[in-house]
Amino acid sequence: MSEYMKNEILEFLNRHNGGKTAEIAEALAVTDYQARYYLLLLEKAGMVQRSPLRRGMATYWFLKGEKQAGQSCSSTT
């Protein structure tokens, strides 16, 4: 993967606290398929993670370790 594309995707996810595949593709001026390819490589490298896969739902990507939108904190005391 090109360092440029890797850095652009990571920067986008950092600035926007995540995003959908289509949003990332549009921001980087690439096709949805190209964006998905790079995102899957970053996921495999452990740098990003995605929302759980559900049929018919958009995939939401975010930096590894970031709290997913709508996820609550649970504490054990």
UniProtKB/Swiss-Prot annotation:
<dbReference type="Pfam" id="PF04703">
    <property type="entry name" value="FaeA"/>
</dbReference>
<keyword id="KW-0804">Transcription</keyword>
<keyword id="KW-0010">Activator</keyword>
<dbReference type="InterPro" id="IPR036390">
    <property type="entry name" value="WH_DNA-bd_sf"/>
</dbReference>
<dbReference type="GO" id="GO:0006355">
    <property type="term" value="P:regulation of DNA-templated transcription"/>
</dbReference>
<protein>
    <recommendedName>
        <fullName>P fimbrial regulatory protein KS71A</fullName>
    </recommendedName>
</protein>
<dbReference type="InterPro" id="IPR006793">
    <property type="entry name" value="FaeA"/>
</dbReference>
<keyword id="KW-0805">Transcription regulation</keyword>
<dbReference type="InterPro" id="IPR036388">
    <property type="entry name" value="WH-like_DNA-bd_sf"/>
</dbReference>
<keyword id="KW-1029">Fimbrium biogenesis</keyword>
